[in-house]
Amino acid sequence: MSEMVDTTQTTTEKKLTQSDIRGVFLRSNLFQGSWNFERMQALGFCFSMVPAIRRLYPENNEARKQAIRRHLEFFNTQPFVAAPILGVTLALEEQRANGAEIDDGAINGIKVGLMGPLAGVGDPIFWGTVRPVFAALGAGIAMSGSLLGPLLFFILFNLVRLATRYYGVAYGYSKGIDIVKDMGGGFLQKLTEGASILGLFVMGALVNKWTHVNIPLVVSRITDQTGKEHVTTVQTILDQLMPGLVPLLLTFACMWLLRKKVNPLWIIVGFFVIGIAGYACGLLGL
């Protein structure tokens, strides 16, 4: 009598740990460290992926070499919002290491497909809204002579930056390929519009608070029965009509000049010249 013995080959599922994800997050802070004109952020992306590649692919294995080469392809996006792309790539690499039929083209296709739309969101949110608003808050405090101003800007901006990077990687990894659905349906456009509206609202309030323009040209002088003289200036009339009108017009003028591609340095110099000349001629006051 012969005895049949069934043998089954078991393989251990390869799984990224929280330590690996934290390692990717920490390395992503050096994302721009090796930026170059040929492949932009490719080296930074590959450097960030190293902890995951070490976990998923054995040392001195062809699969590890392919993974390294795979992430040296051209990549360029806003550096903070590269985090969810890193997270999605982690999920895809994990599935591939466990035998899923995911080729190089699929992984790079997801990266290329996400880096453009996310760059369109990251630039207006971080460079056009978050940084100017925090800088304005810090500058307002610094104008009073307090060191808290620049410290506040540094702390707030980096809190947002680090939170975006960490939770972006974690979110992208947890969602995997499904993140593409979340990016659809006009979500990115609504997010960008909302951030832009909030930024414009805050900057509008700051313009009225911190921009001071005085036009002391006298319109009339009236002496009352007690002999007290009442002077009406152009600035008095403007404040009665709409407080902060001149600073608002100056802001619109700056926006128009910037859209015409005028160098911001020349705009600043122009304001200096107008202010000095206007004060010398008596058109502007302190």
From Swiss-Prot:
Pfam families: EIID-AGA. Residues 144-147, 213-244, 284-286 are periplasmic. Residues 18-55, 63-95 dip into the membrane without crossing it. Residues 1-17, 56-62, 96-103, 177-186, 259-264 are cytoplasmic. The chain crosses the membrane at residues 104-143, 148-176, 187-212, 245-258, 265-283. The modification N-formylmethionine is found at M1. It is found in: Cell inner membrane. Residues 14-284 form the PTS EIID domain. It is a multi-pass membrane protein. One of its GO terms (biological process) is phosphoenolpyruvate-dependent sugar phosphotransferase system. It comes from the Bacteria. PROSITE patterns: PTS_EIID. Keywords: Cell inner membrane, Cell membrane, Formylation, Membrane, Phosphotransferase system, Sugar transport, Transmembrane, Transmembrane helix, Transport. GO terms for cellular component: plasma membrane. InterPro entries: GatZ_KbaZ_carbometab, PTS_IID_man. The phosphoenolpyruvate-dependent sugar phosphotransferase system (sugar PTS), a major carbohydrate active transport system, catalyzes the phosphorylation of incoming sugar substrates concomitantly with their translocation across the cell membrane. The enzyme II ManXYZ PTS system is involved in mannose transport. This is PTS system mannose-specific EIID component.
